[in-house]
């Protein structure tokens, strides 16, 4: 029988999700675009939902993930903190390990 192995990775703390593919994409888009509203639009969610994800992650992890600057003459913006970048790197490593495992298991069928 031929089948394809699939997986979904997320990180939890005290049974609450702190990172998954959607949150990973949101943070990466904030890093790329320098804006929470632009990143939210890019990943197909409302600004309010994006902020709620960020605040929930920060609360659960006990760290600041985003540094924001209010709009105005020079414009606002958002940048990832060092801790957020570390979290993204760790999540990417974990995801890649799962990808390697599924490739290995698929070859052994």
Regions found by a protein language model. Give the residues of each.
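Short, Lys/Arg-enriched N-terminal segment that forms or immediately precedes the first helix
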Residues: 2-15
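Residue cluster at the C-terminal edge of the helix-turn-helix DNA-binding motif
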Residues: 59-64
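Short alpha-helical elements of helix-turn-helix
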Residues: 17-27, 48
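Residues within the DNA-recognition helix of helix-turn-helix
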Residues: 53
């Amino acid at each position: 029988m031929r089948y394809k192995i699939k997986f979904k990775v997320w990180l939890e703390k005290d049974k609450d999700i702190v990172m998954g593919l959607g949150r990973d994409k949101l943070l990466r888009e904030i890093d790329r675009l320098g804006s929470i509203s632009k990143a939210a639009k890019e990943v197909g969610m409302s600004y309010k939902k994006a902020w709620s994800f960020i605040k929930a992650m920060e609360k659960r992890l006990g760290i600041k993930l985003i540094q924001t600057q209010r709009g105005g003459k020079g414009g606002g913006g958002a940048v990832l903190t060092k801790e957020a970048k570390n979290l993204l790197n760790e999540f990417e490593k974990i995801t890649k390990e799962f990808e390697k495992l599924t490739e290995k298991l698929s070859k052994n069928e």
